[in-house]
Amino acid sequence: MKRSMLLCLALLLALWSAACGETVSLPESLGVNASQGTVQDHWDGHGAMGDGTEYWEIAFSPEDAAEFEESLQTAQGWHALPLDNDVRYLLYGTEGMEEAQDGAYISVNPYLTGKDGGPLFPKVEEGYWFFCDEQTESYTAQGVMERPSQNFTAAVYDSQSHILYCGELDT
């Protein structure tokens, strides 16, 4: 009896340990394979109702980065930097008052923020960006800020440091 109890306990412990080796997978909407990269940071701030932010930071070796960058050039929704204005407002906000395209002046805080309330991604000068509006299943940020809820995935790839920053916002 003791032996079977110990065997069951050992089996339970083995299953529990295997479950702890969770793999981190990026959102499918990115449309790219980042499996050669190394997860530097990942956190999920989604609450019980599914609202919140999730963040991934993936680093690539120079060799793997070249292959990854090549895939970004043809992947749907990916663009060479700089960001378009709608995406820039969502990711970084404005620096004080800015003149918008229609001539009005606006001041916007970033929508996709880190745990400290600041922009989730660092500013990147050279690389690629991605945006997918999960509500409309489109690759444009136009109109997202006017909605009462935002559900989108965004990413910025830094070609100089070979790091992919990805975030998901669900409100």
Give the residues covered by each predicted segment:
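Residue-level detector of functional hotspots within protein domains
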Residues: 6, 41-46, 141, 150
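N-terminal export/targeting and maturation segments
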Residues: 20-85
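C-terminal motif of bacterial Sec signal peptides marking the signal peptidase cleavage site
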Residues: 15-19
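Functional cores of ribonucleases/endoribonucleases
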Residues: 77-163
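Positively charged n-region of N-terminal signal peptides that target proteins for export
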Residues: 1-4
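Short, solvent-exposed aromatic-acidic interface loops
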Residues: 168-171
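Cross-family signature of deubiquitinases and ubiquitin-like deconjugating cysteine proteases
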Residues: 8-11
